[in-house]
């Protein structure tokens, strides 16, 4: 690898956006992700996903890398929460002043756009590369790939590999690291609400429904 080579673990939203920032600085960037390339996987095989909401901080980051105008067409403004009670009634609670909104966006489509932008800028994305261990003493990262294990010696490693981070687990084994993990008691249910006969949203698209 080059002397300015950066290795990012995780090709999710954070990892791919970080790659875009670094490529714009002229650095050599490699992203490794344990999952297959979602662009080659039909949506129904890709697992469930909750739409995410973009607020001011998210838009500011996208603006800094020149992606705001590309992402905006994928997003729907939400001006508040719509609370549904057990009797079928609803109450609308605005997020702020008139026209102040956060934006709902498909996590999958957003992630795909960021990965493609990172690749367009010259980052290399290695899918199906599961990080098994990071050896800080020997500056070595071990990956499991479809063809077997490989070991690399990157100059810099950035962890963006989520809740069960392999990088964090490796750090815990080798240095004194405190962290806290909490689980909430709530469950998760995915509902599909088809459009009306006229092809319109069956529920107000400009609100977060609770």
Feature annotation, model-predicted:
Residues 43-113, 117:
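Active-site-adjacent segment of FAD-dependent monooxygenases/related oxidoreductases
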Residues 4-31:
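N-terminal Rossmann-like FAD-binding beta1-loop-alpha1 element of flavoenzymes
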Residues 132-133, 138-210:
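Conserved FAD-binding catalytic core of PHBH/FMO-like flavoproteins
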Residues 119-131:
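A conserved beta-strand/loop element that lines the FAD pocket in flavoprotein oxidoreductases
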Residues 21, 113, 117, 170:
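Rossmann-fold NAD(P)-dependent oxidoreductase module
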Residues 23-47:
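Glycine-rich FAD pyrophosphate-binding loop
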Residues 27, 67, 123:
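Short phosphate-binding/catalytic loops that engage adenosine nucleotides
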Residues 14, 37, 164:
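Conserved Rossmann-like nucleotide-cofactor binding loop
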